[in-house]
Design a protein with these regions (language model features):
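Acidic, polar-rich low-complexity tracts and alpha-helical solenoid repeat scaffolds
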Residues: 1-414
Length: 414
């Protein structure tokens, strides 16, 4: 009143109602803020995200939905409200409605194609692959000219198709088709540092889906020799090639690459991961004490995932190693895990059954965990869940019970 500006401090008043959780009063103020300043959309969505994360009784979503419905029923509502609708529908994973509003937004405004890219990435993260594909196709439909999102969409749709196939058993012909499309992409846009992600995807297809590991190795070697690669990309390619060499039963060259990665990345997760993988190679080969020493060093790694894996492996070896006794079962477990790494499931499962049936509880329970992993890799989730459920009830080892529960939770999230 004093300023004679009734629309002054709308956003600030809305923030006050937000803190009081009075969402019915908050939303009209945020809407008016967007009408006066559409550029404040990011600020408003940040505040709404905060409100949703602290809304323990789920009272804000009905208010947002009612507000959006009322706004979008008007004939000439502002494009910013389509943008708000896209944001909200991404939060609740309603990708089809998000796509509808993205189309409306792009019909009204220029330079909004990135909205489709955001939808696609979010959809892939939540395994909504069909909706992600539609979003990418909307970008590709605009053509190459004056379209900065054309190449990201071409790449994204290839990655999306591959991730979709990985979720269930797929025919070799499906992987061949994606590999062919990746090859066409590389021929069209070149073997350059900007296309390393597609080259890496093609190498993965060759190695693990099409039984052409030699082709994958040549491709990765070519990529590593590419000029003007940044150090992080080079490290990722070397790590991928070292993993492939391990898969190809060439642990010596893999160890050399992992050692190079360690030295080039002494204090980051790339180096720690290389050290972990090198320790796993020693474990596979039966060099148990050296492997355990490396796992012990990695217990303090900055990455929680690497640290947890190192702790688990160190504990497993410590609890089952006989300083003056026979460690053949432990060594056999290591060799069996190497077969599992190489995806030789027909050979792995009988070996695991033998270990489960004849070894001490420490090795038997651990072998059961690995059998569950093998079954999941073969898309036998129900059998894996049954095995894990029985294991968590019968095992007397705390870390085994915890890992069984963790894997069960992962299966339920599927």
């Amino acid at each position: 009143i004093l300023l004679k500006k009734p629309d002054a401090f709308l956003k600030e008043l809305g923030d006050c109602y937000l803190m009081e959780r009075d969402y019915e009063q908050m939303m009209p103020l945020f809407v008016r803020t967007l009408e006066l300043n559409p550029g404040s959309i990011d600020n408003i969505t940040v505040q709404l995200s905060f409100a949703r994360s602290n809304d323990i009784v789920n009272s804000i979503d009905p208010v947002i939905e009612k507000t959006l419905k009322s706004l979008c029923q008007k004939t000439d509502y502002l494009p910013v409200f389509d943008e708000l609708a896209v944001w909200y529908n991404l939060q609740i994973r309603n990708y089809l409605l998000a796509l509808q509003h993205a189309v409306l937004l792009n019909n009204k405004s220029e330079n909004k194609l990135h909205i489709f890219l955001n939808i696609a990435l979010d959809a892939i993260n939540n395994k909504a692959f069909d909706q992600a594909t539609i979003a990418y196709q909307k970008i590709l439909g605009k053509g190459k000219e004056n379209n900065p999102f054309y190449l990201p969409a071409r790449k994204g749709i290839l990655t999306c198709r591959y991730e979709q196939l990985r979720q269930s058993p797929a025919d070799r012909s499906d992987y061949l088709q994606i590999a062919g499309d990746c090859e066409k992409y590389m021929q069209e846009f070149g073997y350059t540092p900007t296309n390393i992600d597609i080259l890496s995807l093609l190498a993965e297809l060759y190695a693990y889906r099409l039984q052409r590991p030699d082709s994958a190795d040549r491709l990765l070697d070519k990529a590593i020799r590419m000029p003007r690669l940044n150090s992080n990309t080079l490290s990722q390619l070397k790590s991928q090639r070292a993993d492939l060499l391990t898969f190809m039963d060439n642990p010596w060259e893999a160890t050399i690459l992992y050692t190079q990665l360690e030295k080039a990345n002494p204090n980051n997760d790339i180096g720690y991961e290389a050290k972990l993988k090198k320790a796993m190679l020693a474990y596979y080969a039966g060099d148990l004490l050296w492997a355990k020493a490396q796992f012990d060093v990695l217990k303090g790694a900055t990455s929680k995932l690497i640290s947890n894996d190192a702790i688990q492996m160190s504990h497993f070896i410590h609890m089952n190693y006989e300083a003056e006794g026979d460690n053949r079962d432990l060594e056999k477990m290591g060799r069996t895990e190497y077969l599992l790494y190489k995806q030789q499931f027909q050979e792995v499962l009988p070996r695991l059954d033998s270990l489960i049936g004849h070894c001490s509880p420490g090795i038997s329970d651990y072998a059961t965990l690995q059998k569950a992993r093998s079954l999941c890799a073969c898309f036998q989730d129900e059998e894996a869940a049954k095995l894990l459920s029985e294991l968590k009830d019968r095992s007397e080892q705390v870390y085994i019970k915890a890992e069984a529960l963790f894997q069960l939770a992962g299966l339920k999230r599927k």
